[in-house]
């Protein structure tokens, strides 16, 4: 088997499980479970792994019948047995066209069927997937086809005073979006300037806290501008004051989003 | 009548332009460039650690989920409190129906400030020429899976 073939095998297997996780109704879930089992059975390397781990035959007719309706499957402690147990369970389900209701009911969460399917696959089938993917990785190493590095590590050379930023937002209700606000070349000075203005413009109930925060930010900006050492005690005082201001400013405000940027930049200042 | 309400949760990227994601299967955290995830052809993301593909929404981080729950609860409570006020106005002066208002409801959780830590190391996947940030744990593994094509 070539390096490429092995990578495709591993990917197809993981994709088959990924599809199972996305099933939204019971017919689709059963169809995708059949495909998943077929992916295992038609692939000699994976099938060999299953056979090596075969410890004993489980009577799932009896196990499901005797199982209390609210009980989850009692998975074996031993890893080999766990592989064999889950594989035989999935075989039994697919060969007998069982409805997910018949065996996955204890895995439900709320009224949605999709959650029952997903939870069963996450809590049970995922264990088998984990064993198989680990085996495939080990097998690749033993076969000597591991080593061609796909991921190359990039050294992060951003530094305070000259960090390039490409800021965006993640919107997390039903979509993921990004808005690019390119502030290339923006440094600690400009963040500090923006932050001081925001602090001055924002109405904060605790006047002393606001005053302290402005003073600390100004002092840090001045020291950075003059190339002087910014003492850790000053960073700590500034961080505490700004964190407290964040709590009063309210989430989502410009002030609440600029403060973490400043804190992060300040904490990254190299110590002498 | 069902009225749809869109609640936006925003979180800025870190200084390198990456946002945090967390696999709901293996709980491993990693970072991607939001613009890459939003490309039309990206329908699923492969976790760099376990390699299982899932819908991008399955990778929301705990802090974002917390704020989604907090904002949703706040909105529901606002509606209920407003309903109580409206009910009081409707039956004001009515001899047959008396409305006794209780204390306004308060949410059980509040939104937290969202910000990215500058952590993890940048890796570039040669297969798709896309970048990601991964933890030391993922780095130490046999090789992270590309979040976009699933190859390692």
Protein language model annotation of sequence segments:
Chain B
Residues 31-33, 56-59, 133-137, 152:
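Short, non-ligating residues that shape and space the ligands of small metal-coordination modules
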